[in-house]
Amino acid sequence: MSAFNLSAIAFILAAIGLVVFMLVVPRLLGGRSHGSQKEEIFEAGVVGSGNARIRLSAKFYLVAIFFVIFDLEALYLYAYAVSVREAGWLGFAAAAIFITILIIGLVYELSLGAMNWAPADKLRKKARLYAAPAGFSLADITKFDGVDELMVDPTGKIPAQSSGQINVSNNIETNRRHLQNIDHINTTGNVTSVDFATSAQTDKMTR
């Protein structure tokens, strides 16, 4: 038996012995614990949180194209790099054309947003309104009609103008009847139903 065969056999036996040592010795010397905490999953020494199955927006076809551009061309350029003197200017021209085509492909992918890995909905940012639109007037939305203007209401009631909390229910008809009876919301936020037309007639009669 040659020395090469002996060294190969020794290497194989040493590898098998190392594996057996690493599997058997810890089980003999290490302690064993049982319980619910034993079944918990650890991530880098801490208790894991959240779901491990996260859906990522991986554009695999773009990854494959980038692999062609950044990895496979190195394989072809390596052959030129080790034979630059033998290839001469003809080899340089061929390598330059090859690299130019790859650069054009890279620029095309960048124009398509291939390097942008964020989800599309996060990229679209709403434009901030720096100026009010044409015809906008703050006085129009803060206008408070006077009592004289409200008295000409066909119902004879003054609508609720002040701010206040109004409790509503899931029944649309109930809300509609409730809103029809609302005439005024006083400063305390309490809703009062007053027929101001009738009150005005009563005041005239008393006068």
Swiss-Prot record:
Keywords tagged on the record: Cell inner membrane, Cell membrane, Membrane, NAD, Quinone, Translocase, Transmembrane, Transmembrane helix, Transport, Ubiquinone
Catalytic activity: a quinone + NADH + 5 H(+)(in) = a quinol + NAD(+) + 4 H(+)(out)
GO MF annotations in UniProt: NADH dehydrogenase (ubiquinone) activity; NADH:ubiquinone reductase (non-electrogenic) activity; quinone binding
Enzyme Commission code(s) on record: 7.1.1.-
GO CC term (a single one): NADH dehydrogenase complex
Main location: membrane
Membrane topology type: Multi-pass membrane protein
Compartment list: Cell inner membrane
Transmembrane feature ranges: 6-26, 62-82, 87-107
Catalytic class of the enzyme: translocase
InterPro entries: NAD(P)H_OxRDtase_bac/plastid, NADH_UbQ/plastoQ_OxRdtase_su3, NDAH_ubi_oxred_su3_sf
HAMAP family attached to this UniProt entry: NDH1_NuoA (MF_01394)
Function (record text): NDH-1 shuttles electrons from NADH, via FMN and iron-sulfur (Fe-S) centers, to quinones in the respiratory chain. The immediate electron acceptor for the enzyme in this species is believed to be ubiquinone. Couples the redox reaction to proton translocation (for every two electrons transferred, four hydrogen ions are translocated across the cytoplasmic membrane), and thus conserves the redox energy in a proton gradient.
Protein family membership: Belongs to the complex I subunit 3 family.
Subunit structure: NDH-1 is composed of 14 different subunits. Subunits NuoA, H, J, K, L, M, N constitute the membrane sector of the complex.
Official protein name in the record: NADH-quinone oxidoreductase subunit A
Gene responsible for this protein: nuoA
